[in-house]
Every structure is written in structure tokens, then in C-alpha cells.
A protein has these predicted regions:
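A conserved structural/catalytic subdomain of Rossmann-like adenosyl-cofactor enzymes
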Residues: 1-186
Length: 186
């Protein structure tokens, strides 16, 4: 097991899958769930070497989920240095109509807090589709922001903001309340 630890993981685990009891039994009791994406995330956390880094795509359900999801988020803050989350709009249409998130963390480093950045649709774009997919250039503003992370407020709503660990705990680990898309608040 220890020989298979890795320095870097970049992953897009399957969303919405349900694992049976035989698979769940391979995980510590506090992390047992049938949700495939959650189990993949826990596995990635265990496979990282100390100071190993991970970037992972997760569905919005992880952001607001409680129970095992909250336990995973707590562990990410306490021991895995979760530092940045990029909130994405629905980028996988027509295959999946779910908002997704990019989470970045480093094993063995407690989090001081988490930067959240909401990546809105570009001007004039109402959705990404098979014929009009999200492109690398749509991340240009994220890359600019990442180089010098600063809070951003657009029309009175947080687009980018740093949340302390205490603030995230006070939200009961409901990361969905951090820089949500405007239509989600209405």
C-alpha cells in the first residue's frame, strides 16, 4: 500500500454512482457511503504522499451535503489543506445538467481557510453545450485571479472570497453557501 502513494492526483471521478456494501466495507466507518464520487475522493486522500497535491472535479451535491460529505470536508480542512474551490456552471451539458466544482488540496497541511471563486458564463453565453463547449480560454479570468487571489464582488454578490475555517464550520460545512451562482440564491 505505502509503495503506491503518489505526489499528484488530478481526477474527475464518476458522479451519481452507487456502490454496494462490499465496496463500502473497504473504507473506514466514518467515510462509508454508497456515493461513488465521495469514495473516490476518500481514496485519493489516502493515496497521496505527505505534501502530495490533488485537484478534483466534484458535483454540487458534495458542496451542500452533510453526513459523510461533511465528515470528508472536515478532514479536508483539518488534514488536507483544502485551499481553493472553483465553482463551475453546468459545463457537461448535454451529458449532465449539474454544476461542478474544482477542489484543490495538499495532504498534511491544515487549512487556514478556503478561497472560493465562482466562474460565471462568459458575456452572451447562457449555457455550454455539445456544439458550444467550455473552452480553455474560459478559464483565463480564473488564472488571472489565481495569480493574486483577491476578493471580488459583482452586483453585491461574492464572486471570489476567502472563508476562514471557523466560517466554514459555522456554515456546518455547507460549501454551497460560498460564492453561489446568483440564480441559486433567488
Amino acid at each position: 500500500y505505502l509503495q503506491r502513494l503518489v505526489d499528484v492526483i488530478v481526477a474527475n471521478p464518476p458522479f451519481g454512482g452507487a456502490e454496494d456494501d462490499a465496496v463500502k466495507q473497504n473504507f473506514p466507518a466514518e467515510f462509508r457511503t454508497s456515493e461513488t464520487a465521495d469514495l473516490f475522493l476518500v481514496l485519493m486522500m489516502y493515496l497521496l504522499k505527505d505534501k502530495g497535491r490533488c485537484g478534483v472535479v466534484l458535483p454540487d451535491g458534495f458542496m451542500f451535503g452533510d453526513g459523510v460529505k461533511a465528515t470528508i470536508k472536515k478532514r479536508m480542512l483539518d488534514e488536507f489543506g483544502l485551499h481553493t474551490t472553483i465553482r463551475l456552471p453546468q459545463v457537461f451539458k448535454p451529458y449532465a445538467s449539474v454544476n461542478t466544482n474544482l477542489l484543490f488540496f495538499q495532504k498534511g497541511v491544515p487549512s487556514r481557510g478556503v478561497w472560493f471563486y465562482r466562474l460565471d458564463y462568459p458575456e452572451g453565453v447562457k449555457s455550454f453545450t455539445k456544439t458550444r463547449p467550455m473552452l480553455d480560454k474560459h478559464f483565463d479570468l480564473v488564472r488571472e485571479w489565481w495569480a493574486d487571489k483577491q476578493p471580488i464582488v459583482v452586483e453585491g454578490k461574492d464572486k471570489a472570497r476567502f472563508f476562514t475555517v471557523d466560517e466554514l464550520v459555522a456554515l456546518n460545512y455547507d460549501f454551497d453557501k460560498c460564492c453561489p451562482f446568483p440564480h441559486e440564491e433567488e
